[in-house]
Amino acid sequence: MLSPDDIEGHLDALQRIGDRAAEARADYEFSGDMLRTVYAAEYLKSELPRAADKEAEALASEAYRKALEDRRNAFVVAEKLRHERAWRERVIDAWQTMSANARGRIL
């Protein structure tokens, strides 16, 4: 059975995860805006005559690739924190259930 110290550790971690998860989510949302901004800047920088060529050049640019990589990394961080939060919540739920069942047997 889980000890009260284990549960306290999970609760403390949940509290710490909250701020980090909010920042990670904000970074992910911001990276989407940056991706569009970088694309537009690269598109406008192109000296090619056709729109399709400008688009291809913008999408193939190093700046766009970097912005895309930053977005992916932000998503990974946000998802890892979301997963950790969910896992810790399930551990606490299991402890609550086990504690309730144990109280029922004691009476």
Predicted regions and their residues:
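Terminal, low-complexity, charged helical segments
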Residues: 2, 106-107
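Long amphipathic alpha-helical coiled-coil segments
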Residues: 25-28, 32, 36, 69-102
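Surface-exposed polar/charged interaction patches
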Residues: 17-20, 41, 61, 105
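Short, glycine/alanine-rich amphipathic alpha-helical segment
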Residues: 48-77
